[in-house]
Amino acid sequence: MLKSTWSWRLAAPLATCVALAALLAAPTRVTAREKPPLARTAPLFEFHSNFWVNLHQVLFHEAWLRAGKPVRGLQSAAPLSAAGMSSQDEADWRAAVSFYAAHFANRQQHGDDQLIQINDDLAGQPDNGARLSPPDLPPELIAVLHRAAGVYRRYWWPAHDESNEHWIASQAQRLQHLGPGLAAAMTKDLHQQWPAAPIRVDVCHYVVALGYALTTLPPHITFSSSDPFNPGLDRFELLFHEASHTFADTTMNALETEGRAQHKDVGDLWHSLLFYTSGVELRRLLPASEQATFTPYGYRNRVYGGGHWPAYRRVLEADWQPYLDGKIDFTDAIHSMVADLP
């Protein structure tokens, strides 16, 4: 049996990474009591199309399909298939999917230490023909991945890798033109700096669920290159929304402290605030021709539509927006949002 939890480990960077140098510029709004952050010299993100992470994510996706999971959490409603597969290849692939279905089909990547560890460990494995060597992965999982690797490489990996590289290239121009300003604005808004090292982004053909996943120790985003639900600017905005989880502690702590002082449950207000902030700041940076048609991800996808989130939207629009507009300070915005929660 696989262990239920594994220790965290920093995945080693790949020599073949694709780094896009989007450097931080000075903030667009600085008050008298705020100093602009030092100019950033490291890239914001480091992009990879890693064979082993892609294989793992594909098998996880196939396992969800076999279990009949909702299509909204998947990028395709049909299992992978290929003409001319040998009977041995079919048997090897079915065995790998069966293993994943037995161990992972009823689990989510978000918050699952074991799945996080698998993804992080595989991200440190180069595709150089050598056998997998992460010390924290159990031998039975390594054996399954090795058995499936040849099948995946023969039938699907070339097309998936091409799709991933196209996705990475599609973000390059926007990162160059919008990335520095968006990162500067969001870190200023949240009173916390971007991580010192570039955030690793593993681009995969499939990512369960919703087409993206994030872990913060270390910062690591996994993003689908084929997700039909996140087209165009949604992808770019989501990239920065996910990144903002890595510099949200100051805001989260401020909300929780104010909530205790006012005897209010602030719940997931911090998370709705991240969606709201990335949308507002991205719109401000877009050319006028795009601003007119741009709808932030949170609104377009009805993120604020269920549970306590309609109330979060109201306090964000009433109390956080004036802060983003420079009309009130951070402390007043935090106090007002909590006070206006039901």
What spans do the regions from the language model cover?
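N-terminal secretory signal peptides that target proteins for export/translocation
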Residues: 1-8
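Active-site recognition of the HExxH zinc-binding catalytic motif
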Residues: 236-253
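Pan-zinc metallopeptidase signature
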Residues: 294-342
